[in-house]
Swiss-Prot record:
Database matches in Gene3D superfamilies: alpha/beta hydrolase
Naturally occurring in which organism (per UniProt): Xenopus laevis (African clawed frog)
Identification of the protein by name: Alpha/beta hydrolase domain-containing protein 17C
Localisation per UniProt entry: Recycling endosome membrane; Cell projection, Dendritic spine; Postsynaptic density membrane
GO CC annotation terms, alphabetical: dendritic spine; endosome membrane; plasma membrane; postsynaptic density membrane; recycling endosome membrane
Keywords, ordered alphabetically: Cell membrane, Cell projection, Endosome, Hydrolase, Lipoprotein, Membrane, Palmitate, Postsynaptic cell membrane, Synapse
GO MF terms, alphabetically ordered: palmitoyl-(protein) hydrolase activity
Chain spans, region Disordered: 48-67
UniProt lineage: Eukaryota, Metazoa, Chordata, Craniata, Vertebrata
Catalytic function, reaction form: S-hexadecanoyl-L-cysteinyl-[protein] + H2O = L-cysteinyl-[protein] + hexadecanoate + H(+)
GO biological process: regulation of postsynapse organization
Gene: abhd17c
Function: Hydrolyzes fatty acids from S-acylated cysteine residues in proteins. Has depalmitoylating activity towards NRAS.
Amino acid sequence: MPEQGPRMNGFSLGELCWLFCCPPCPSRIAAKLAFLPPEPTYTVREMEAPASTAQQPPREEGSGEPAACSLHLSERADWQYSQRELDAVEVFRWRTERGSFLGCMFVRCSPGSRYTLLFSHGNAVDLGQMCSFYIGLGTRINCNIFSYDYSGYGVSSGKPSEKNLYADIEAAWHALRTRYGVTPENIILYGQSIGTVPTVDLASRYECAAVILHSPLMSGLRVAFPDTRKTYCFDAFPSIDKISKVTSPVLIIHGTEDEVIDFSHGLAMYERCPRAVEPLWVEGAGHNDIELYAQYLERLKQFISHELPNS
């Protein structure tokens, strides 16, 4: 999987002043600290309508109407599969309540499977870079995967912000349910790194089949200042205060040598979570290499195939 971003702590005094004083606003702090959108690695093009329907009025984006779109990957996307696999990837754009149009992707890895992962990726990648990983993961754990780019990432319009992050996953949730008819009891929310923030927020408001938190953070301030012991009013991404409201089963995965989001964050989230299942603490793993350890796939398979209902 592509790297999910650089270190987020260990700032100099000058950097801290820039983060928290220009201006001292949580959303601006969050954007400076957490969002690193790469140069887009893909485009989404709407295909020409057949001659018989060419005179019909254009479809409104985000309306839930099926639209024929094609995915075009750049060389930076590092595509690893054949055209047959690429044909199993559907892309479209969906409007959020805050006015952004999100790039969305549905990967049919396992058509007969019960579960679909709603995957919120890390802070320094886009769908083009993640597409190959999604196909490999979904095939191995027998799940389809739905993902989306945050506002300001990939082909998604708007700018990255904490408020947009929550609106983005809300739109993705409704797109998955409306466009593909996937019901909540068949949706597994999967968040990685910064993607755990919208995942916890959504899971605290909607019940689903399960939640997977991969390298989660307690809050933005606790990443920048590891000695922080409580949530302040100006903190960003306060997942630690929301996790207690999650009523679905939660699997937490964290590397013990994570150099970006300390292992203590995963432990604290696990201890605060009312429906946590047996976690996966990957001994020696950092922030960007958990997927390389055999126990990663083993634990996911065990959780999805044996600990969740599959009838």
